[in-house]
């Protein structure tokens, strides 16, 4: 292609010039060899381009990352011409966008499930809630749990069942609904440190309930013994008794409803249940229900308390003669039986003798028949003196059996009270 130029350069004659000395000198053409090298490089590049175009017409090699791309993609026929533009489609989103998405999600509250349940119960006016009510409060108060509602409901249920600080209260009769109520144990009010729900002092453990401990009842109990909250309750069992009780001693029951007998763990009750029933006492008709215990005709609150103390002493020292003699009531052959009460005569070891017709069984001072013709014990003397006329009007003398068992050496001769 450039051959005529090369031949022209070679065929140019050498010009002669004179030196300062007058001698002829030769001038070489500078850059002749360099021009030849450049011509050869251009020829090689042109031949290589010609070969590539002849083999792949319509294609042009674009070296980007060692990959040959079609001409139309390089010139802008559907693909990015700039490598920086090519990578923008597959580039990861910036960190600011991910941070903004995390910021929009609500954070988890720093409270435990026990603290959340306690908040829900305390905000209720009645201080009790069902499981659904507790979950509704937590969802409405904290948006984090609102978005993840079904996942943590079982955790609330497990915490209610496994922690002693929560007490299950049955639903009141006549109030339709599903599920029981849950409340806080009164002894767990100081469970959190300084009222802060973030710090819990220690795991609450419910202690064993003591006899007579007050439990919160969701609805009023049926007619029961008035001594439920008495420090010295004494259950009295017997058949329905017509005598009128002392005003204020026991609650009045509704007509047509059977009152329940108090089953209270008291030493006096164990004493009554473990003692044999007096065999000679007249039996009431079968099917008679438990009635409201009738008080003593000559009784007072001081007498009931004293009898309870004497019964506990006998319970602890029942084999000691000194304690047994303090608990006995001496009776004679004929007397009066208070209607509605039973005669129970426990007998210590070794007592096998039977008294004569002039004597009657010795009894323990509890709801026992009192005789108007027996010497009252020192404890009952101050109360029985003013009530002999009342006892004569309440029960006939012929109601008592002629014979009874008693302990040997404990009965005294008959004498009027």
From Swiss-Prot:
<dbReference type="GO" id="GO:0006357">
    <property type="term" value="P:regulation of transcription by RNA polymerase II"/>
</dbReference>
<dbReference type="GO" id="GO:0009653">
    <property type="term" value="P:anatomical structure morphogenesis"/>
</dbReference>
<feature type="compositionally biased region" description="Basic and acidic residues">
    <location>
        <begin position="1"/>
        <end position="29"/>
    </location>
</feature>
<keyword id="KW-0539">Nucleus</keyword>
<feature type="region of interest" description="Disordered">
    <location>
        <begin position="70"/>
        <end position="105"/>
    </location>
</feature>
<dbReference type="GO" id="GO:0000785">
    <property type="term" value="C:chromatin"/>
</dbReference>
<dbReference type="GO" id="GO:0000978">
    <property type="term" value="F:RNA polymerase II cis-regulatory region sequence-specific DNA binding"/>
</dbReference>
<dbReference type="InterPro" id="IPR036388">
    <property type="entry name" value="WH-like_DNA-bd_sf"/>
</dbReference>
<keyword id="KW-0238">DNA-binding</keyword>
<dbReference type="InterPro" id="IPR030456">
    <property type="entry name" value="TF_fork_head_CS_2"/>
</dbReference>
<dbReference type="Pfam" id="PF00250">
    <property type="entry name" value="Forkhead"/>
</dbReference>
<dbReference type="InterPro" id="IPR018122">
    <property type="entry name" value="TF_fork_head_CS_1"/>
</dbReference>
<dbReference type="InterPro" id="IPR050211">
    <property type="entry name" value="FOX_domain-containing"/>
</dbReference>
<dbReference type="GO" id="GO:0000981">
    <property type="term" value="F:DNA-binding transcription factor activity, RNA polymerase II-specific"/>
</dbReference>
<feature type="compositionally biased region" description="Acidic residues">
    <location>
        <begin position="30"/>
        <end position="45"/>
    </location>
</feature>
<dbReference type="InterPro" id="IPR001766">
    <property type="entry name" value="Fork_head_dom"/>
</dbReference>
<dbReference type="GO" id="GO:0030154">
    <property type="term" value="P:cell differentiation"/>
</dbReference>
<dbReference type="InterPro" id="IPR036390">
    <property type="entry name" value="WH_DNA-bd_sf"/>
</dbReference>
<keyword id="KW-0804">Transcription</keyword>
<protein>
    <recommendedName>
        <fullName>Forkhead box protein D4-like 6</fullName>
    </recommendedName>
</protein>
<dbReference type="GO" id="GO:0005634">
    <property type="term" value="C:nucleus"/>
</dbReference>
<feature type="DNA-binding region" description="Fork-head">
    <location>
        <begin position="108"/>
        <end position="202"/>
    </location>
</feature>
<keyword id="KW-0805">Transcription regulation</keyword>
<feature type="region of interest" description="Disordered">
    <location>
        <begin position="1"/>
        <end position="50"/>
    </location>
</feature>
């Amino acid at each position: 292609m450039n051959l005529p130029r090369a031949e022209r350069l070679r065929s140019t004659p050498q010009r002669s010039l004179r030196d300062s000395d007058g001698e002829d000198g030769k001038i070489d053409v500078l850059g002749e060899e360099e021009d030849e090298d450049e011509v050869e490089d251009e020829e090689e590049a042109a031949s290589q381009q010609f070969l590539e175009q002849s083999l792949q017409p319509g294609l042009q090699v674009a070296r980007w990352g060692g990959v040959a791309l079609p001409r139309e993609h390089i010139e802008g026929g559907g693909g990015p011409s700039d490598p920086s533009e090519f990578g923008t489609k597959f580039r990861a989103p910036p960190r600011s966008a991910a941070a903004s998405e995390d910021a929009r999600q609500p954070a988890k509250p720093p409270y435990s499930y026990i603290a959340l349940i306690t908040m829900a119960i305390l905000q209720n006016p009645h201080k009790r809630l069902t499981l659904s009510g507790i979950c509704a409060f937590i969802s409405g108060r904290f948006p984090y749990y609102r978005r993840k509602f079904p996942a943590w409901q079982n955790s609330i249920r497990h915490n209610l069942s496994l922690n002693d600080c929560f007490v299950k209260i049955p639903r009141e009769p006549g109030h339709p609904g599903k599920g029981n109520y849950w409340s806080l144990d009164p002894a767990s009010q100081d469970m959190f440190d300084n009222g802060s729900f973030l710090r819990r002092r220690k795991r609450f453990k419910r202690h064993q309930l003591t006899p007579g401990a007050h439990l919160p009842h969701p609805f009023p109990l049926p007619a029961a013994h008035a001594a439920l909250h008495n420090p010295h309750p004494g259950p009295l069992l017997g058949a329905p008794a017509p005598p009128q009780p002392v005003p204020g001693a026991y609650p009045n029951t509704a007509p047509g409803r059977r009152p329940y007998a108090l089953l209270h763990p008291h030493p006096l009750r164990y004493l009554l249940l473990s003692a044999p029933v007096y065999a000679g006492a007249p039996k009431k008709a079968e099917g008679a229900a438990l009635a409201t215990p009738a008080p003593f005709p000559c009784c007072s609150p001081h007498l009931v308390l004293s009898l309870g103390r004497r019964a506990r002493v006998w319970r602890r020292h029942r084999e000691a003669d000194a304690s047994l003699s303090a608990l006995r009531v001496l009776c004679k052959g004929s007397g009066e039986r208070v209607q509605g009460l039973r005669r129970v005569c426990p007998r210590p070891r070794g007592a096998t003798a039977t008294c004569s017709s002039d004597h009657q069984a010795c009894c323990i001072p509890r709801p026992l028949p009192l005789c108007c013709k027996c010497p009252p014990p020192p404890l009952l003397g101050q109360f029985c003196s003013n009530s002999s006329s009342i006892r004569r009007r309440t029960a006939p003398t012929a109601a008592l059996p002629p014979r009874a068992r008693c302990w040997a050496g404990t009965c005294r001769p008959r004498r009027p009270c």
